[in-house]
Amino acid sequence: MRFRGLDLNLLVALDALMTERKLTAAARRINLSQPAMSAAIARLRTYFGDELFSMQGRELIPTPRAEALAPAVRDALLHIQLSVIAWDPLNPAQSDRRFRIILSDFMILVFFARIVERVAREAPGVSFELLPLDDDPHELLRRGDVDFLIFPDVFMSSAHPKAKLFDEALVCVGCPTNKKLLGNISFETYMSMGHVAAQFGREMKPSVEQWLLLEHGFNRRIELVVPGFTLIPRLLSGTNRIATLPLRLVKYFEQTIPLRIVTSPLPPLFFTEAIQWPALHNTDPGNIWLREILLQEASRIDPQSDTC
């Protein structure tokens, strides 16, 4: 199909190239052979009068013209999908759909494991691709490259719908051999002790507890930074360091790692875990189905009684 001399199939190829940044992967994404994808690039270059991509090693580097075209092309394809091509109804028992979800290691352990278990029973052909926290998850959401974000609602965009999962408390924790934790600790002691903290993505963005503490004006002495919450409990063992962690994560690790929760001198710290999905997928039957499962399972999580 052509529109003003442009084969619209070439826009699908351009979108795949911008997403994958590798020729073979882009060709595989839209079920083309590598020679056919190379031919599509040549035709795109002719139509737009621009090189569009250069090769650096095996990676395709887009030109400014390609970067400028990419958002409009992706939005146009998404609107065609939603406005012209109807969403397929979902039969969970027979579906082979794959959902891509960005979430933290903490949420995989304490929440998403129960989703995997339930879906395995109700929709055995459905699969998941669980992705680490990205430097720009909202761009992935806008492009429809992920089905859900699952993380604290304070980090979520106002441009897409979202729903609350549950509230989470943050607690102060350390190794039971740490003599400074035998009783209540003062604010000065808390601030002077070495802390272990998680940061995420290539830009090392702060985790929710660090964000909340900075919002209160508390700048801790962080001695060890790791790329995820689940690494922290083991790294506290045998040291005098402390961490401020989600309570459910501490309860999970208490079964295998000696940990001590201490009364914090800080005001109680809480955050809300939530889900967010692309606005353009709001009426997608598959998205609605999984959304309902996520909310149902969240409602079954025991409320917390402990606080910092």
Curated annotation (Swiss-Prot):
Gene name per UniProt: nodD1
GO MF entry, a single one: transcription cis-regulatory region binding
One Pfam family named in its UniProt record: HTH_1
Superkingdom, taxonomy of origin: Bacteria
Residues annotated as domain HTH lysR-type: 6-63
Keyword Ribonucleoprotein: no
Upper classification of the organism: Bacteria, Pseudomonadati, Pseudomonadota, Alphaproteobacteria, Hyphomicrobiales
Note: There are at least three nodD genes in R.meliloti. They differ in their specificity of interaction with different flavonoids and, consequently, contribute to the nodulation of various plant host species to different extents.
Protein name: Nodulation protein D 1
Role played: NodD regulates the expression of the nodABCFE genes which encode other nodulation proteins. NodD is also a negative regulator of its own expression. Binds flavonoids as inducers.
Start-end of DNA-binding region: 23-42
InterPro entries: LysR-type_TF (IPR050389), LysR_subst-bd (IPR005119), NodD_PBP2 (IPR037416), Tscrpt_reg_HTH_LysR (IPR000847), WH-like_DNA-bd_sf (IPR036388), WH_DNA-bd_sf (IPR036390)
Entry keyword Transcription: yes
Homology family: Belongs to the LysR transcriptional regulatory family.
Annotated keywords: Activator, DNA-binding, Nodulation, Plasmid, Repressor, Transcription, Transcription regulation
Cited Gene3D superfamilies: Periplasmic binding protein-like II, Winged helix-like DNA-binding domain superfamily/Winged helix DNA-binding domain
Cellular compartments per GO CC: protein-DNA complex
